[in-house]
Curated annotation (Swiss-Prot):
Source organism (scientific name): Legionella pneumophila (strain Corby)
Domain TRAM: 5-64
GO process annotations (BP): rRNA base methylation
Name this protein carries in UniProt: 23S rRNA (uracil(1939)-C(5))-methyltransferase RlmD
Keywords: 4Fe-4S, Iron, Iron-sulfur, Metal-binding, Methyltransferase, rRNA processing, S-adenosyl-L-methionine, Transferase
Lineage: Bacteria, Pseudomonadati, Pseudomonadota, Gammaproteobacteria, Legionellales
Length: 444
């Protein structure tokens, strides 16, 4: 029998917010049922309207704030209410950190079934103009005869929020969004550009135009003139990721760069490579990870999900040898390139399936005293399940998803005999609910 959808009550409701969800939405309890309301803060009394009725929870749209929280601040971005790029600009920066730290510790307790012996002080950076990588959507609107450039709408990802600025983006692109829009508006084929990837190094900013059809000579000229006037490297992507090429300057090498000044290391990377979006926080994160590793000259370290060597190369300056393993062959090539350009010789890199620890062991027949793990959001489940075959005395786990960190912590602590010494958050993404964290495990 077909289920009948519950009818929405469209009259406004009033409720007090009692908590925050993992994604930063306010939680109200209405007749014992959780209602999630974007933009509401704990302690506030809000007026809202139901937008979705589910079996176990409801969702609502914030209409007004009857009793505001002292933690509430005015969002800096004029597009904040619609844009899906940020979710916490209405909360003070200090409270954002407390929310993320509390969320991490709650997950470690609930799903990791343990608590750290100590909690690290949060790592923070500048809250604005920190983001060095982003993807801007573009769409030419026939009715308006103008181009929209922006991020997806928070409540309807099918649509684009047209923006004139973005205060979390690298300061250069923040001020040039309006010029990007004007560029596309003047092109002969205004439907050609589907999206624009932004990637910034320490000294240069690159734009990758995803062109759905070949550019006309006139449009190529306009892009060159734009790049020259506003000082961008421009890449074109006419097909898949392997089709990206440097379009302007035509004689330029394809790499951007960033530096870890404390270690006198400079990394070169392609705009499509994975790099941390927040350069200032990344520098602090690398230093904290190395401090937690407590490296000795005799240590041989395994760096899993090593990427282009962001942790491997600075660690190599403090130990006997580092072996980096990465699933992406292109990143392994980049890691070797960076080791060579920085004259670091006590590192080796391998491409392997990181869900198969035995494949890693067969590639690298070495004993490791310490391991650093920096996995994607899916975590490192297969690695921690097979950690006995590596048997390190110390593990530093850098996480971009506290839920999978908590899951993997449960295995390490309650099945593999490790102790969670310390853990804490790193605010890689201010004004969003994304939680980056770091944890130290010691063999019990």
């Amino acid at each position: 029998m077909r289920k009948v959808k519950p009818k929405l009550n469209l009259t406004s409701q009033t409720a007090r917010i009692v908590n925050l969800s993992h994604d930063g939405r306010g939680i109200a309890r209405v007749n014992g049922k959780a209602t999630f309301i974007q933009g509401a803060l704990p302690g506030e009394v809000v007026e809202f309207q139901y937008t979705r009725i589910k079996k176990d929870f409801d969702e609502g749209k914030l209409l007004s704030i009857v009793e505001p929280s002292t933690l509430r601040v005015e969002p800096k971005c004029p597009h904040y209410q619609m844009c899906g790029g940020c979710s916490l600009q209405h909360m003070s920066a200090e409270e954002q950190i407390r929310f993320k730290q509390s969320h991490l510790l709650d997950l470690l307790s609930r799903y990791g079934h343990t608590e750290p012996q100590s909690v690290l002080s949060p790592l923070t950076s500048h809250h604005w103009n920190y983001r060095n990588k982003a993807r801007l959507s573009t769409r030419f609107v026939e009715k308006k005869q103008s181009t929209m450039v922006g991020f997806r709408e928070r409540n309807n990802p099918r649509f684009i929020t047209e923006i004139n600025q973005c205060p979390i983006l690298n300061s250069k692109i923040d001020t040039d969004i309006v010029h990007l829009r004007k560029l596309i508006d003047t092109m002969e084929d205004k439907h050609c550009i589907a999206q624009i990837e932004v990637a910034a190094g320490d000294n240069e900013v690159a734009l990758i135009f995803r062109n759905l059809s070949p550019l006309t000579e006139q449009d190529e000229l306009k892009i060159r003139e734009f790049a020259q006037q506003f000082q961008y490297k421009v890449f074109l992507q006419p097909g898949g990721l392997d089709s990206v090429f440097c379009f302007y300057p035509s004689d330029a090498h394809a790499y951007l760069s960033y530096e870890l000044p404390d270690y006198q290391i400079t990394f070169q990377f392609h705009p499509n490579d994975f790099t941390q979006v927040n350069a200032e926080l990344n520098r602090k994160m690398v230093t904290q990870a190395i401090q937690l590793m407590e490296l000795k000259n005799s240590d041989i370290v395994l760096d899993l999900f090593c990427g282009l060597g962001n942790f491997s190369l600075p660690m190599a300056k403090h130990c006997s040898r580092v072996i980096g393993v990465e699933g992406n062959k292109n990143m392994v090539e980049r890691a070797y390139m960076n080791a060579k350009s920085n004259h670091i010789t006590n590192v080796d890199f391998y491409a392997a399936n990181l869900d198969d620890v035995m494949e890693v062991r067969n590639l690298v027949n070495t004993s490791f005293s310490k391991v650093l793990i920096d996995p994607p959001r899916s975590g490192a489940l297969e690695i921690v399940k097979q950690i006995d075959s590596i048997d390190p005395e110390r593990i530093v786990y850098v996480s971009c998803n506290p839920i999978t960190l908590a899951r993997d912590t449960d295995i390490l602590v309650n099945q593999k005999g490790y102790v969670l010494i310390t853990a804490g958050v790193m605010d890689m993404f201010p004004h969003t609910a994304h939680v980056e964290s770091i944890a130290l495990f010691q063999k019990g």
